[in-house]
Amino acid sequence: HIVLTHFKWSLARLKEAIENKNTEYHKGAALERFRLTYNLALETIRAFANEQGQICHTDKSCFEWVREKKWLDNETNWSYLVADYKKIQIWQKGDETEKIYRELRVHYLLLNHLGQSMTLKKE
């Protein structure tokens, strides 16, 4: 899957963005990279689902399908990931954006685990 390759590349860039200095510019760049990586995650999930005759119409249905495939643990709370993604779509600076920025490391770990699971299933 070429889309999986793009997703993994974006994950690497997200990790780099998170590790940058804690300036307004770098925070904005990290949040933008999170948005892009999230979109690629969904695109990748949909590609795998389509191969198996499944259609994910919503973000929630995509992550539920991933959980059914056991690519994420049942305890994984992906709903925070989805909620934070939706919040940054509004893109307002302030406390909420700062909170999401602080959660990016957790979101990265979840997305990275998902990417690793997809890679193993592909092989």
Give, region by region, the residue ranges found by the protein language model.
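Solvent-exposed interaction patches of small proteins and small membrane subunits
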Residues: 1-123
